[in-house]
């Protein structure tokens, strides 16, 4: 099932990587319903993996999954593979635009417009940590807290992620808030993530970051309150 390029380092490395691939697939099948694994199964069938030496890998991360070509480039012996395989597992390559998990990419002339990449990356980190004990990037702590709160409010968040269903998530959030508020919430997660990934948050960014964080947290509290209120009203009507 798993295809390795001619650039593999040696049989030992290849065997270790093969074990990681099997560990990933088994864990996903144990954890999630089969209906949520259609993209994983489709993409694993045609996945190509390139194991590279560090001097050949000109990229700030230790692994990278290409959504369009369904190729994974990774440094030898690195557990970042689990994060990237989660990206693979929710990559809808049949869509004319690239939809991967909660992230949407639209090509407009020479530019690529993205939306909800922050939510997608953070939730991928959360799942990689939960399922495979991958350490979460410490610079994204606050955004992780917000997305964990979101997960508590949206019970089927893992299923929406694996089925690349951002639309359904927005509709769910809009049941108790407005559509614009829901889209703003997702956009603000993007902004927070972008600031956090700078690693060195400049002094002038701190106030902006704090304001965006408070606004994003308020949205979640507002959603929870309005949902609880509506559910309580329904219960009272049944009495």
Task: Please describe what each predicted stretch is.
Residues 137-239:
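Pan-zinc metallopeptidase signature
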Residues 13, 17-20, 78, 82, ...:
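Hydrophobic (often cysteine-bearing) scaffold residues that line and stabilize catalytic clefts
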Residues 102-152:
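Post-HExxH zinc-binding segment in Zn-dependent metallohydrolases
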Residues 2-75, 95:
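Auxiliary, metal-adjacent structural segments of Zn-dependent hydrolase domains
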Residues 2, 124, 237-239:
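Non-Sec secretion/translocation targeting segments of pathogen effectors
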Residues 79-96, 121, 125, 129:
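Active-site recognition of the HExxH zinc-binding catalytic motif
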Residues 13, 17, 74, 88, ...:
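Generic alpha-helical structural element
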């Amino acid at each position: 099932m798993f295809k390795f390029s001619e650039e593999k380092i040696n049989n030992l490395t290849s065997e270790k990587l093969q074990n990681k691939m099997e560990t990933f697939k088994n864990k996903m099948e144990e954890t999630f319903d089969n209906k949520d694994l259609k993209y994983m199964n489709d993409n694993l069938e045609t996945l190509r993996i390139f194991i590279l030496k560090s001097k050949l890998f000109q990229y700030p991360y230790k692994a990278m999954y290409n959504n369009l070509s369904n190729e994974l480039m990774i440094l030898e012996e690195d557990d970042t593979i689990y994060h990237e395989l989660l990206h693979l597992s929710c990559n809808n390559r049949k869509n004319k635009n690239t939809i991967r998990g909660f992230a949407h990419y639209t090509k407009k002339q020479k530019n690529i417009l993205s939306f909800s990449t922050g939510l997608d990356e953070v939730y991928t980190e959360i799942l990689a940590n939960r399922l495979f004990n991958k350490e979460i990037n410490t610079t994204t702590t606050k955004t992780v807290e917000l997305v964990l709160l979101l997960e508590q409010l949206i019970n089927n968040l893992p299923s929406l992620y694996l089925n690349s269903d951002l639309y359904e998530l927005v509709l769910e959030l809009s049941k108790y808030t407005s559509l614009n508020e829901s889209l703003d919430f997702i956009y603000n997660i993007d902004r927070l993530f972008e600031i956090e990934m700078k690693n060195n948050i400049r002094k002038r960014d701190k106030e902006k970051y704090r304001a965006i964080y408070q606004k994003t947290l308020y949205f979640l509290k507002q959603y929870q309150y309005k949902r609880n209120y509506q559910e309580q009203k329904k219960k009272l009507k049944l009495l």
